[in-house]
Amino acid sequence: MTREEMTKERVTMLEIGQATLQEREGVMALLRANHADNLGEAERRDGFVTTNMTPEQMTALIAEENGVTVARDGAGVAAFALAAPWGFWSQWPFFRNMIRILGNYRFGGVTLTEENSYQYGPVCVDRDYRGRGVFERVFAASLRTMEDRYPIMVTFVNQANPRSYAAHSRKAGMATPGTFDYNGSHYYLKIGRAHV
């Protein structure tokens, strides 16, 4: 069996669900391996994440917010998507900036607020699984965890990350109502309905 055939078989066997505390280290390892700070320029062209989290923050996201959706490959984590109310994200200056500008945007005729929207992302798919429908499966499962609580999801995409922009625009169907700058970087604001 070729590597390609083995990967296809592994993709069909992925289990999608909410992360447990035992999977925290697998999520953290995938986050670190794909963080822009840990990638060369060529690797960043294939997508990257920019959010850093401590083990304690990840524990809270898993245990208190039920906000980590994973694709499991046996005992490992092949992909994840993070999602939580703005209150969780407000501990980061970047997200406090997003909260500050929410009211500048509307979606479906509604002005965005902390009460009617939540922050989705980052999402990360292991390189071996990219382009195989894993993003779509993890994205849909993540939406289901929040759809009863918030009608609107909001995220950001670094303008230097065209792979993420394409995934969120084409595969996730998210709109781009505007852009914003933070700390010398340029971002797209992405908005979508919080249901499958």
For the regions a protein language model found, what residue spans apply to each?
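Conserved GNAT-fold acetyl-CoA-binding loop/helix
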Residues: H35-Q57
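Conserved acyl-donor/pantetheine-binding loop and adjacent beta-alpha core of acyl/acetyltransferases
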Residues: L82-P122
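Conserved acetyl-CoA-binding loop-helix of GNAT-fold acetyltransferases
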Residues: V125, G131-R144, R170
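Conserved active-site alpha-helix within GNAT-family acetyltransferase domains
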Residues: E136, Q159-G178
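A short helix-loop-beta-strand connector motif used in the catalytic cores of GNAT acetyltransferases and
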Residues: E56-V70, G87-P93, Q119
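Conserved beta-strand-loop-alpha-helix junction that forms the acyl-donor binding cleft
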Residues: G121-R130, T155-Y165
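Conserved GNAT acetyl-CoA-binding A-motif
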Residues: N116-Y120, M146-N158
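Conserved N-terminal entry element of GNAT/NAT acetyltransferase domains
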Residues: M1-E25, A29, A33, D37-N38
